[in-house]
């Protein structure tokens, strides 16, 4: 009878020790990779040169403020030097930034915003990497 009790205790202790070992492959993943996007993390200024059909590029500056207001400046490089400005409010939902008055959204990524197409999907193709606004906080 003692043998059964000792053996059961040994098996229990063995399982306890084995369960404490973390052998998962994702245990070394950087914690910042999966940080929940919050309003405070995206406040600042973003710059980028978006593709343009009939001009060299669309120089874009997007400023997001803490009171949920945004200012978006476009300059059509090589066409019209006057900036086109849009002001409104912004909303963050499930990692996507929606600017009031615009039909498209931005996907929030570390230190950048990636413009999505009108259906809310990532833009694909040769110019996909140019639909990015990078955080500069000027």
Q: Can you describe what each PLM-predicted range is?
A:
Residues 88-90:
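Extracellular/luminal ectodomains and secreted, surface-exposed scaffolds of diverse proteins
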Residues 93-97:
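Short, conserved beta-turn/loop elements at beta-strand boundaries and strand-helix junctions
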């Amino acid at each position: 009878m003692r043998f059964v009790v000792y053996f059961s205790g040994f098996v229990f202790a063995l399982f306890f020790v084995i369960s404490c070992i973390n052998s998962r492959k994702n245990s070394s993943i950087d914690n910042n990779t999966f940080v929940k996007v919050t309003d405070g993390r995206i406040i600042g200024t973003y710059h980028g040169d978006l593709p343009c059909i009939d001009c060299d590029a669309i120089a874009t500056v997007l400023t997001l403020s803490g009171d949920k207001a945004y200012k978006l400046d476009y300059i059509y490089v090589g066409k019209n030097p006057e900036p086109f400005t849009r002001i409104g409010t912004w909303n963050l939902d499930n990692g996507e930034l929606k600017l009031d008055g615009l039909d498209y959204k931005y996907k929030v990524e570390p230190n950048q915003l990636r413009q999505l197409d009108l259906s809310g999907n990532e833009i694909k193709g040769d110019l996909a990497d140019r639909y990015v606004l990078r955080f500069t906080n000027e």
